[in-house]
Amino acid sequence: MKHFESKFLTRQLTTDQFTYNQIIGMLIPLILDQLFIYAISLLTTSMISSSGQDSVTAVTLVTPINFMITMIQAAFCSGGAVVIAQYKGHGDTQKVQEAIGQTIWFSICITTVMSLVVFFASRQIIEILYGAAEVGVKAKAKLYLAGMALNLIIHAPRTGTGAGLRGVGDNKHNLYGSLLVNVSFFFFSLIFINWMDMDIEGTLLAYCLARTLGLFSSVYFLFIQKNGNVRIRLKQMLLPKKEYIKSIWRLGVPFSTEEIFFNGGTILVSSYMVLLGTTSVAAHAIANSVFTTLYAPLTAVGILATTVIGQCIGAGRRDLAKKYGKKLVIMGYVVITAFVLIVLPLLESILQLYNPEPETLKVTWKLLIIGMSGMVLFMPASTVMPYTLRAAGDAYYSTGVSLVTMWGIRVGLGYLVSIVWGLGIEGIWACMAVEWILRSILFLIRYCGQAWLKKKNVIEAEAESDEK
């Protein structure tokens, strides 16, 4: 049986660029990394729920804003990861090191600017977006938003370092850093929220301490670890270089634009979701927390696509990029189906961690049934394919598709279905499933063509620039 599995995986995944052992070896740490991130978030949300429904609602309202900042930061780092992966595929070690340093520099700069703006405008942001919310909820939301904005500055070097590790395919050490941050965050949350009853303040303090440990882990990987895959010199991080910043910017701007408008749409959905009542908002918060944990393996496959496709493109092997693009989507279907089947029998116990009220629990179950049905059927293609296109440099198409489907279906149709037609929070989740269907179709059309494979990689773009 073992010989058959090895032979099958060799036939499916092994090429002259990667062996199946390398692919699986990169995937497993990524899945574990994403699972720990989402599982710790799930457990923390359940801890916050012990402080009352106001706290859960406040965190839910702020999460899309916080997530937007985080994803803009991650978007530019993803652009950096593509650059790093392409240089890695080309075999240029010095360029890889310089690209890692520049990615971290960019991450720190962009995060600091965004976080300070949100910190000083936190009161106005909450009033504008969630003025209809209850007074107690708004007070907690303002505190949480301001605190999380400052916390993200501490997290910026760790995000850049993670992009470097993913770009070179060293997901094992990235997992170690992620485990340090997330496990310590869980224990700090346990102390400050459950034992000391510090509510929102406890969550913020836990984030601060855990992300400080993450900062120390980045220093270790970058400057102390001997023979590390991302070891760099300090000047490679402190002195900005035009050619790298230009490449990171070229790939990062479409990513970040997508995140701004995508999460802006999520915030708008949250703002009209408030009109459906606290029960609907709380049910959405719980269902979304569980759902994002289920989503973790797909995110892992998508991140793997950045490394694999990026290195194939950097090596000039566009034929392999096409092959692996298809294989990774299939891998996404296998992984998510297996994971949903494993988690499904445990859902009842997981939901009880949130101490939901009976009516909230009833609505939560409905949302999860809608979400999981669409997830297994449509999410692998709609999630993994954009990573493949971006890793090849085709960032604008994936951004355009994501924005049109998000604003047209989830925001526009979601408002009509939930508010105007009166189908409530269930209507919003049904629209999410429709969005995944449309995304899958549009990305499949692009993948079957050749335009995404004709984009210049960073080596070709650099050579063209030198000629000019």
Language-model-detected regions and their locations in the chain:
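N-terminal transmembrane alpha-helices
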Residues: 14-46, 50-51, 67-79, 111-115, ...
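Helix-terminus/linker motif at the lipid-water interface of multi-pass membrane proteins
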Residues: 38-57, 126-135, 191-198, 260-293, ...
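Small-residue-rich hydrophobic transmembrane alpha-helices
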Residues: 45, 56-116, 155-174, 270, ...
